[in-house]
């Protein structure tokens, strides 16, 4: 078998890896094998954490909405609020509801009371 000299192609590839890993600490930014391993690990972690970020933000929005609802003092929960919202087909997503709850509480309470009234009215009509 003939010998293949990789020359500048290998250097170019390794240089790309080194630029990616330039901010890593110690051997993780200096040794070629550990650079490639750390690159794979970093990319896997970034992919995983991107999905975790979505999950954490959703739980944050739910917590904020629930806190404002329970602050009203009524024995009403987030679960009942979202159920009533879907029952009257008012589709405001959790992100927007959480922002309204934080920035403009009076407006959120207006929405909350409307949803409660509509849901109670529909429930009353269905019973009778």
Curated annotation (Swiss-Prot):
InterPro entries: Ribosomal_bL20, RIBOSOMAL_L20_CS, Ribosomal_protein_bL20_C. Keywords: Plastid, Ribonucleoprotein, Ribosomal protein, RNA-binding, rRNA-binding. CDD domains: Ribosomal_L20. Coiled coil: none annotated. It is found in: Plastid. It comes from the Eukaryota. The keyword Plastid applies. GO terms for molecular function: rRNA binding; structural constituent of ribosome. One of its GO terms (cellular component) is plastid. One of its GO terms (biological process) is translation. HAMAP family: Ribosomal_bL20 (MF_00382). Binds directly to 23S ribosomal RNA and is necessary for the in vitro assembly process of the 50S ribosomal subunit. It is not involved in the protein synthesizing functions of that subunit. Belongs to the bacterial ribosomal protein bL20 family. This is Large ribosomal subunit protein bL20c. The gene is rpl20.
